[in-house]
C-alpha cells in the first residue's frame, strides 16, 4: 500500500522539497547502516559498516524516523555499541528509467533506543503505518528506536542533488 505525503501547511514548497516529502512519506522501507565492531587479528577491535533492510515510520510530532527492532538482530547489537546510523531511502526502480537517476535520500543521524515507558509516540506512529505489526509491539524482545536526523543528501535525478541540514530534514518529517 503506497502512502501519500501528508497535507502540508506551507503556502509554498520547492519542487525538490515536494519530491523529497513524497519519497519519505510514500516509501516504507530503508537500508539501515550501523557500525559493527569485529575482533581484530591482534585483539584490536575493528569497526566496519553493516547494512540491514528495515521498515520505518515517521513520528511527525517528534520529527524523527521510527524503527521497531528485535534484540536478536545484529543491527540492534550495533546500535547499543554506537548510535551513529545512516538510512538510505530510494524510489522504486522503473525499467524505463536509468538507475543512476533514481531518486534517493541518505539520512545520517543518531539512534535512540527507547524504553517501553518512553515509546508511546513512536509506537503510535509505527502502528499508523504498519497496523499489522501490533502483535509484534507486545513482544518483550522488541523495542522502538528513534532516528534523530543530523544531515542528509537528496538526489532527485541527474544534476539535482543537494545537502540537507537537520532542520530541513525535520521540517520534511512534519505532517
State where each predicted segment sits:
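An N-terminal domain-cap segment
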Residues: 2-80
